[in-house]
Swiss-Prot record:
Chief location: plastid
Protein name in the entry: Large ribosomal subunit protein uL29c
Record carries keyword Zinc: no
Naturally occurring in which organism (per UniProt): Trieres chinensis
Cell compartment(s), UniProt: Plastid, Chloroplast
Record family assignment: Belongs to the universal ribosomal protein uL29 family.
UniProt keyword annotation of Ribosomal protein present: yes
Gene Ontology annotations of biological process type: translation
């Protein structure tokens, strides 16, 4: 697997980020399984997989938070508008 920079990950759409999260979790599981069964593996790959997983989840979470905040602001505006129109402040 080639190393993808964080700036390149940000440009990915949400669907690709979700797929990358699943793929990275599988990779991390396989590496941990190799470690537990004392099969040959490269220990630094576990660190890279954990870091990549954290970065991908951070990007996805920040996007979802921004979307939720945007929706929340819209809902609050509608509620305030409705309260203003009905006289319920």
């Amino acid at each position: 697997m080639s190393t993808v920079q964080f700036n390149e990950m940000i440009a990915l759409p949400n669907s690709e980020i979700s797929q990358a999260i699943i793929q990275t979790e599988k990779e991390l599981f396989q590496l941990q399984f190799k470690k537990a069964t004392r099969q040959p593996f490269k220990p630094h790959e576990i660190k890279k997989a954990k870091r990549r997983l954290a970065q991908l989840k951070t990007i996805l979470t920040s996007r979802l938070d921004a979307l939720e905040k945007k929706r929340g602001n819209t809902v609050m505006k509608l509620i305030k508008k409705q309260n203003y129109m009905t006289g319920n402040f």
